[in-house]
């Protein structure tokens, strides 16, 4: 990734260029009642290029693919050239290199989608086992993002951001009386953070009617 970004920055004709990029891996499993509604894995890439021409101004280009990144840099440069404004001088800032990584006890990227499905299915079944609960919505999701920032002055920063979540929603009914409740958990940790959380489902199942 660093080589791709560096190559795009090197191709820039602007006085100053910066690229912010995010690559996000995500998985999601959703139950609605007893029906498995969603089970998928996605990988997304996107970001923004900012270019400065000192005798013009700032130009911006966005992207959602690494293909053609150099073209997006050129587009930002052309936008900057088209801007009419006062000359701009940036304050001198020494280049920074940093890499912020995380160590997950149980990296959810190494857990199969079927195991994630079994986990949220188990919590959903706890809710459905109670007679008064008529409908449920149970969601497992995780995301692992890598955030990159680089500029033409030599700064390069990479940061990892994990997030794992479960959301449980239940609707209980007794006659005309309907109550809805939910429990949720979202933490910047690994798969272990959402294992053994049966108490969330049990607590939610005690909706007072």
PLM features per residue range, with description:
Residues 1-207:
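Active-site bordering "gate/hinge" segments
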């Amino acid at each position: 990734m660093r080589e791709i970004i560096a190559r795009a920055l090197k191709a820039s004709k602007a006085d100053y260029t910066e690229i912010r990029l995010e690559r996000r891996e995500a998985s999601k499993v959703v139950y609605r009642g007893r029906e498995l509604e969603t089970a998928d894995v996605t990988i997304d890439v996107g970001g923004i290029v900012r270019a400065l021409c000192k005798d013009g101004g700032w130009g911006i280009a966005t992207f959602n693919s690494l293909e053609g990144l150099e073209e997006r840099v050129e587009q930002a440069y052309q936008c900057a050239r088209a801007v009419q404004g006062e000359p701009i001088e940036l304050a001198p800032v020494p280049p920074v290199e940093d890499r912020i990584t995380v160590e997950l006890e149980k990296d959810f990227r190494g857990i199969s989608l079927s195991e994630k499905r079994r986990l949220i299915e188990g919590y959903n079944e706890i809710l459905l086992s109670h007679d008064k609960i008529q409908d449920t919505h149970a969601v497992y999701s995780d995301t692992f993002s890598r955030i990159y920032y680089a500029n033409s002055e030599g700064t390069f920063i990479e940061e990892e951001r994990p997030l794992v979540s479960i959301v449980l929603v239940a609707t209980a009914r007794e006659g005309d009386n309907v109550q809805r409740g939910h429990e949720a958990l979202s933490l910047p940790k690994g798969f272990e953070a959402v294992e053994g959380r049966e108490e969330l489902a049990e607590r939610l199942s005690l909706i007072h009617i």
